[in-house]
């Protein structure tokens, strides 16, 4: 039975209403600092911890709750007579409910202007200590670290004469240990990343110990294949515009492959400034286009490879209106993603309830790291977020690209970044014409891309080609030129660059080097 609560929170959302409800249930409230002032200003009867312990806060607030009268009241087992006798001897009442969340360390160190001193001052000491004490003694103490749990605790207290079930206490305790582990992991990541800076005046973005923390969003029916189990986890701090921010408006539950493919489509489409559509199959774009609106962009993207688009993932960077919805609804689609859907578009898809509609607000945030598991280890790299600007390009052939060709080259290069290596992409007039992906040799990717265009009835005459990495030999270049390409964009850097450039001059095509490779595995 909860008779006394200690409340000390950094995240004060909902805390006044929660405390008022506790007070209405006859619970005595202890508090500290800013939380105590907030509750007192709201008209609540609050006892400051310093008054409760008889020991003042000291060291600029570093020592507030580190006192036997606090931790004794939390840690005492109510079922052990010797514990209760010790409390009575030292005049220590039990603390039955602890409501604490911690100094905002992660938010502090994420600011560019954050100094080491700022970070250190935002390492909470008393909070984690109380949380761990209460979580350890969860049989007797209810501990709340997440404002989302306020309502659950109140409902149980009202229904059970101020008591909270062991099942709920156990669940809340596990949240505490997960929270403090994440908190300490963030501190470790930050401080170990500074080791090189302190010793060599250069900060290392990759800490000596790398801690990851995610919260489970949902269990999935299965993984990449039906015999694999799976779940989806969200980052503790989801970047603006990231897939994990999705709001599912309708449709079946998302699968593992749906989420993976949706991320590939969304990451590609949101890089465009004009209305764009990206169709993805098995994490590869099979059609990408820009247009005057979503409907035109979709029509052009679908032309690239109607066969592969069947059962694909479609992403837009503009609202899906009725016209676009009607066009998409004629095809079999697994997932449709957009910043928004008009009411008329929603009505179109109401007749196709299996289609998963995901609404995601646009944003340019991205993950800090790209992660890949290997046997017994983890590969960590910065995200491939490099977007080449026109001024960075270098024309290496006798013939320069025309303005139209340059537009097509930049479009092709943007798409190639999201195609599995080896990647060859034919483009023209704001749309992909043929995509060759994931082949072990670049020349085979070139052949496949040209075959794809032929199968779709699209001409490659006058097209632009992007290659995600350099041409190791002239053979790949010969294939794309034979198919009709008149300009090529590629990183360069091959030992045979001179031979490849000479071949381009021989064919009288324009070649542009980016100096940037976009391998994608």
Curated annotation (Swiss-Prot):
Pathway: Purine metabolism; IMP biosynthesis via de novo pathway; 5-formamido-1-(5-phospho-D-ribosyl)imidazole-4-carboxamide from 5-amino-1-(5-phospho-D-ribosyl)imidazole-4-carboxamide (10-formyl THF route): step 1/1; Purine metabolism; IMP biosynthesis via de novo pathway; IMP from 5-formamido-1-(5-phospho-D-ribosyl)imidazole-4-carboxamide: step 1/1. InterPro entries: AICAR_Tfase_dup_dom_sf, Cytidine_deaminase-like, MGS-like_dom, MGS-like_dom_sf, PurH-like. It holds the Pfam family MGS. CDD domains: IMPCH. Its EC number is 2.1.2.3, 3.5.4.10. SMART domains: AICARFT_IMPCHas, MGS. Keywords: Hydrolase, Multifunctional enzyme, Purine biosynthesis, Transferase. GO terms for molecular function: IMP cyclohydrolase activity; phosphoribosylaminoimidazolecarboxamide formyltransferase activity. NCBIfam families: PRK00881.1, purH. Belongs to the PurH family. HAMAP family: PurH. The IMP cyclohydrolase activity resides in the N-terminal region. This is Bifunctional purine biosynthesis protein PurH. It comes from Paraburkholderia xenovorans (strain LB400).
């Amino acid at each position: 039975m909860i008779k006394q609560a200690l409340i000390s929170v950094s995240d004060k959302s909902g805390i006044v209403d929660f405390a008022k409800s506790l007070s209405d249930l006859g619970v005595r409230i202890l508090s500290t600092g800013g939380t105590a002032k907030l509750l007192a200003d709201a008209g609540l009867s609050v006892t400051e911890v310093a008054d409760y312990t008889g020991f003042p806060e000291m060291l600029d607030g570093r020592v507030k709750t580190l006192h036997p009268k606090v931790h004794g009241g939390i840690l005492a087992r109510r079922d052990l007579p010797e514990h209760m006798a010790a409390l009575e001897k030292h005049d220590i009442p039990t603390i039955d409910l602890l409501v604490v969340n911690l100094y905002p360390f992660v938010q502090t160190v994420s600011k560019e202007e954050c100094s080491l001193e700022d970070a250190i001052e935002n390492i909470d000491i008393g909070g984690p200590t109380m949380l761990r004490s209460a979580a350890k003694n969860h049989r007797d103490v209810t501990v709340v670290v997440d404002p989302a749990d306020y309502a659950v605790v109140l409902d149980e207290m009202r229904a059970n004469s101020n008591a909270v079930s062991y099942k709920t206490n156990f669940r809340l305790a596990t949240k505490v240990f997960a929270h403090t582990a994440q908190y300490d992991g963030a501190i470790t990541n930050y401080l170990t990343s500074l080791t090189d800076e302190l010793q060599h005046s250069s900060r290392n973005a990759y800490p000596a110990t790398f801690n990851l923390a995610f919260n489970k969003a949902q269990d999935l029916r299965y993984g990449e294949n039906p015999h694999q189990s799976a779940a989806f986890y969200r980052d503790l701090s989801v970047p603006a515009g990231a897939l994990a921010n999705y709001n599912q408006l309708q449709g079946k539950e998302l699968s593992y492959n749906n989420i993976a493919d949706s991320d590939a489509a969304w990451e590609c489409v949101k890089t465009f400034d004009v209305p764009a559509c990206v169709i993805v199959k098995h994490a590869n774009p099979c059609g990408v286009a820009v247009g005057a609106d979503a409907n035109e962009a979709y029509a052009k993207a679908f032309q690239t490879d109607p066969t592969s688009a069947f059962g694909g993932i479609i992403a837009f960077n503009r609202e899906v209106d009725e016209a676009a919805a009607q066009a998409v609804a004629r095809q079999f689609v697994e997932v449709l993603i957009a910043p928004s859907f008009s009411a008329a578009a929603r009505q179109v898809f109401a007749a196709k309830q299996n289609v998963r509609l995901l609404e995601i607000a646009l944003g340019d945030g991205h993950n800090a790291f790209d992660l890949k598991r290997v046997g017994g280890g983890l590969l960590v790299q910065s995200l491939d977020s490099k977007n080449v600007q026109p001024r960075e390009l270098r024309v290496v052939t006798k013939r320069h690209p025309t303005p139209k060709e340059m537009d097509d080259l930049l479009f092709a290069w943007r798409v190639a970044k999201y195609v599995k290596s080896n990647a060859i992409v034919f483009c023209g007039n704001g749309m992909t014409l043929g995509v060759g992906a994931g082949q072990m040799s670049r020349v085979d990717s070139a052949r496949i891309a040209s075959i794809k265009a032929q199968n779709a009835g699209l001409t490659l005459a006058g097209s632009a080609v992007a290659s995600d990495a350099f041409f190791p030999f002239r053979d790949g270049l010969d294939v794309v030129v034979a198919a009709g390409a008149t300009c090529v964009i590629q990183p360069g850097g091959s030992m045979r660059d001179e031979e490849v450039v000479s071949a381009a001059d021989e064919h009288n095509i324009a070649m542009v080097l980016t100096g940037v490779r976009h391998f994608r595995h």
